[in-house]
Amino acid sequence: MMVLVTGGFDPLHAGHIKYFEAARELGSKLIVGLNSDDWLKRKKGKVFMPFNERKIILENLSMVKRVISFNDDDDTACDAIYQLIKM
């Protein structure tokens, strides 16, 4: 079973790792939906680490099966869920 977590992860910290570990226990594949730089600017007013750098870091975590970008203009994870269903 796939498990989806979403967020900006900017910057990635120990709390995120614990979140990923807990989510990974719920299924066999952990998929991370990564929010865009535009989303971060709207939410936090700035970007600490650009999307591509955050994506590379997440992709190199052994517990993460795949990282997807998604459109979060409506402040939901619906687009990420839709992409997950299509996988």
What is each of the regions a protein language model found here?
Residues 1-87:
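Nucleotidyltransferase catalytic core that binds NTPs
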